[in-house]
Amino acid sequence: MAKLTVKDLDLKGKKVLVRVDFNVPLKNGVITNDNRISAALPTIKYIIEHGGRAILFSHLGRVKEEADKEGKSLAPVAKNLAEKLGQEVIFPGSTRGAELEAAIDALEDGQVLLVENTRFEDIDGKKESKNDPELGKYWASLGEGIFVNDAFGTAHRAHASNVGISANVEKAVAGFLLENEIAYIKEAVETPERPFVAILGGSKVSDKIGVIENLLEKADKVLIGGGMTYTFYKAQGIEIGNSLCEEDKLDVAKSLLEKSNGKLVLPVDSKEANAFADYTEVKVTEGEAVDTGFLGLDIGPKSIAKFDEALTGAKTVVWNGPMGVFENPDFQEGTIGVMDAIVKQPGVKSIIGGGDSAAAAINLGRADKFSWISTGGGASMELLEGKELPGLAALTEK
């Protein structure tokens, strides 16, 4: 990666501004999954072990008005991080002002301070999300010309806390997480060891058009599963019953199939039910067609076998999007089958592109078997599309 990284800097005695991604799920003030906090530890530890004074910025959820602040404070995150680091995390509870500035000025080498949720600045004119120049300049002024971006999850957005700070410091560099994310995903797509197989699931073709187009050029095979299967089916005149279908994307699906040169691999059967939630009957379709009054909610056993065969010998696999409604035990076999088919390939570099696929791997006990699980759904999708990420573009060149 031709950008400066945290290892290229002298950090001792410096106030180091760090954008992390602590956008973790909270239920009644309790963090239900702290993976993103753990993912930021290597960079934070490196800074404090090298005598830097770490000043951390993160958003949490969406905040549009005063009422949205309820339950969106980073206070529980500060507590969790302090436990993980084994030291105090100073939390003034504000995004600007005299109290925050005094706390930063009082920092000693090796100490950590967490600024309050950056999106609290969105209440007045979306200053964070719209990259307000004054806010970026103010936050940059809290440090000493050094900014470390370690938030891959927001790298596809130009916000005041990433692009805004970057524009107002002498050196904007990548943290270890950002560096790894880019290395794994970009290298997999740009210079993969072959055979390179991409697997795309999820419900909407519209979310994945750019990704499918880019990967059809780069991958040896692109396997399609999940709800978007049925838009591809209908585009070919296959009966889909009550299955999910994007009627306005039938032409796109048809054109993708036509230009795929056989690289696009679709399921050959489905697990169908007579309703999404309160169903009374679940069965496997005979072939591709879904029965009248039923909807496809997972790929079927023949499809799992077909995908297993398509993955045989693969050296690079990128997977984004589950094969079915994996949260329901009745419709998780497809996702499990595909995960198992990926991880059993000898010497495979296996990458999960964040979002629901990451949740599936974690919830279904397969996370430790993958080479890399991305922390950013939207950002990894844009990398897979071949787009440049604003948060990355704003970093200083080596």
UniProtKB/Swiss-Prot annotation:
Coiled coil: none annotated. Its EC number is 2.7.2.3. It catalyses: (2R)-3-phosphoglycerate + ATP = (2R)-3-phospho-glyceroyl phosphate + ADP. Keywords: ATP-binding, Cytoplasm, Glycolysis, Kinase, Nucleotide-binding, Transferase. Pfam families: PGK. The keyword Transport does not apply. Its main location: cytoplasm. It is found in: Cytoplasm. ATP binds at K208, G296, E327, G354, G355, D356, S357. Pathway: Carbohydrate degradation; glycolysis; pyruvate from D-glyceraldehyde 3-phosphate: step 2/5. GO terms for molecular function: ADP binding; ATP binding; phosphoglycerate kinase activity. The keyword ATP-binding applies. GO terms for biological process: gluconeogenesis; glycolytic process. Substrate binds at D21, F22, N23, R36, H59, L60, G61, R62, R119, R157. It is an enzyme of class 2 (transferase). Belongs to the phosphoglycerate kinase family. HAMAP family: Phosphoglyc_kinase. Monomer. This is Phosphoglycerate kinase. It comes from Streptococcus equi subsp. equi (strain 4047).
